[in-house]
Curated annotation (Swiss-Prot):
The keyword Metal-binding applies. This is Large ribosomal subunit protein eL43. Part of the 50S ribosomal subunit. Belongs to the eukaryotic ribosomal protein eL43 family. Putative zinc-binding subfamily. Keywords: Metal-binding, Ribonucleoprotein, Ribosomal protein, RNA-binding, rRNA-binding, Zinc, Zinc-finger. It comes from Picrophilus torridus (strain ATCC 700027 / DSM 9790 / JCM 10055 / NBRC 100828 / KAW 2/3). Its cofactor is Zn(2+).
Length: 85
């Protein structure tokens, strides 16, 4: 039996479906979404995503808005939003 997770990590659960490029891209965002991040308030590495764009620290219960897959916004998004205001 072939190993599905050598190239694509957690996306190996899809087996041979969807192609390796799509599975690699999905895997990159999925790992970002599920990772722990540093809390901006208490500096503990306990921040997890609760919903799309909503992040919560499991240590101090601090909730804040952030990106969809990452609590920090990228510089490109900040420039784009600032340009539209």
């Amino acid at each position: 039996m072939a190993k599905h997770t050598v190239k694509v990590g957690v996306a190996g659960r899809f087996g041979p479906r969807y192609g390796v490029t799509v599975r690699k891209e999905w895997s990159k965002y999925y790992v970002q979404k599920k990772a722990y991040y540093v809390c901006p308030k208490c500096k503990q590495k306990k921040v997890r995503r609760i919903a799309n764009g909503i992040w919560e620290c499991r240590h101090c219960s601090y909730k804040f808005a952030g990106g969809s897959y990452n609590p920090e916004y990228s510089a490109e998004i900040v420039r784009e939003v600032a340009g539209n205001v």
